[in-house]
């Protein structure tokens, strides 16, 4: 019996340590597949052996599920624990004190819980490795455009970025690029309203062609042009339904979906770009100042929670919390009280990439 227990402990260690050990590692998709495969085999062997050793069955399943899943959830929930350092740049003067005259940098807080997650700012080669062969779709309004810009800036050099920036910022248009070196395709889809995002996801479903990473968000246009939070809420619920029907394993369907551990299903990673902090007095038109008030912003936020589209309320999308990032960076990080300086979106992109790392290593 001692032998059985030791074997059980060994199996538990492998199951727990393989995914945890991968946490600091940058994996391309192929490597990810390899390690999910290795993990799957380990699990399968474990599952087949454990019936012969009933005393360790509970132990193995409890340890593996609790430790791995909890560790993953905790780290995902800590991803936005960042601090900013905003200082006057050399060109600063009281007459020249725009946001561009402040240097800003950010980093994850050094609390022990956050350090334990070993978040890291991915370098260009890390990010290229992670996204090698992927199809990334970023859809939404100007906030989404800044996310697309930040992601491309991480992957390409500044010479390439000059021309891309021009094309990407053509008003209200879509943009597509294939980064040949890493075979990554990125689509930016201009989709100012939630209904546009719903149309987009229905299109993926119709064509049975899904991106690997889907990043989307909307709200500002609706707030400005409709100023009706409950209508926004209705549109979010439609989007949620559409995304849920897209995903092979949805939170609601659970056991109806493919059985975990059977043929692996490829499921897109879906992110929500939250609205930024709005600084009413800095907004650049009368209509914006009138309609995009703090109260309206609060009502839109409540609808977002209520729609259950976000992971934190049981939905499928992981929030990139631009509000918290922009709030913490502060008034010196924006010129118009709505669009923030590039570092805010860079932070959001790094948070997204870290979430992808966590999810791809520890998905069982
Ligand atoms: C920023 O500049 C304005 C004038 O452009 C001035 O009134 C204000 O005091 C300056 N603020 C700081 C913090 O220097
Ligand atoms: C991307 O993957 C391909 C094939 O797996 C490989 O040949 C190439 O070197 C990779 N590129 C990068 C930048 O990792
Ligand atoms: C987005 O949706 C609105 C309202 O449903 C529609 O008028 C507009 O044409 C759509 N825009 C795009 C780019 O699909
Ligand atoms: C707001 O939207 C809801 C739902 O679409 C609609 O029933 C209501 O009449 C709208 N309110 C206003 C003031 O337009």
Predicted features along the sequence, with ranges:
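A compositional signature for long Ser/Thr(±Pro)-rich, low-complexity
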Residues: 1-364
């Amino acid at each position: 019996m001692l032998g059985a227990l030791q074997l059980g402990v060994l199996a538990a260690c492998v199951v727990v340590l393989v995914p945890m050990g991968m946490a600091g590692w940058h994996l391309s998709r192929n490597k990810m597949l390899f390690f999910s495969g290795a993990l799957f085999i380990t699990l399968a062997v474990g599952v087949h052996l454990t019936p012969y050793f009933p005393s360790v069955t509970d132990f193995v399943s409890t340890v593996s599920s609790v430790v791995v899943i909890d560790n993953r959830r905790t780290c995902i929930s800590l991803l936005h624990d960042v601090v900013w350092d905003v200082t006057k740049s050399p060109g600063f003067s009281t007459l020249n004190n725009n946001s561009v005259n402040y240097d800003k940098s950010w980093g994850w807080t050094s609390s022990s819980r956050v350090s334990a997650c070993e978040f890291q700012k991915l370098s260009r080669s890390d990010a290229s490795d992670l996204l090698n062969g992927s199809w990334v779709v970023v859809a939404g309004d100007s906030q989404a455009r800044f996310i697309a810009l930040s992601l491309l800036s991480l992957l390409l050099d500044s010479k390439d970025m000059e021309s891309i920036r021009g094309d990407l910022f053509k008003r209200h248009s879509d943009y597509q690029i294939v980064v040949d070196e890493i075979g990554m395709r990125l689509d930016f889809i201009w989709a100012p309203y939630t209904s546009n995002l719903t149309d987009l996801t229905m299109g993926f479903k119709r064509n049975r062609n899904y991106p690997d990473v889907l990043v989307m968000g909307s709200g500002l246009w609706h707030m400005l042009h409709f100023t009706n939070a409950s209508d926004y809420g209705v549109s979010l619920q439609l989007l949620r339904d559409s995304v849920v029907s897209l995903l092979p394993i949805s939170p609601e369907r659970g056991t109806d979906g493919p059985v975990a551990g059977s043929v692996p299903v490829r499921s897109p990673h879906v992110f929500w770009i939250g609205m930024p902090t709005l600084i009413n007095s800095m907004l650049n038109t009368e209509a914006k100042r009138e309609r995009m008030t703090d109260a309206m912003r609060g009502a839109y936020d409540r609808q977002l929670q209520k729609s259950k589209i976000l992971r934190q309320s049981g939905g499928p999308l992981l929030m990139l919390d631009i509000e918290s990032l922009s709030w913490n960076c502060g008034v010196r990080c924006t010129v118009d009280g709505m669009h923030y300086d590039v570092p805010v979106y860079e932070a959001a992109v790094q948070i997204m990439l870290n979430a992808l790392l966590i999810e791809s290593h520890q998905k069982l």
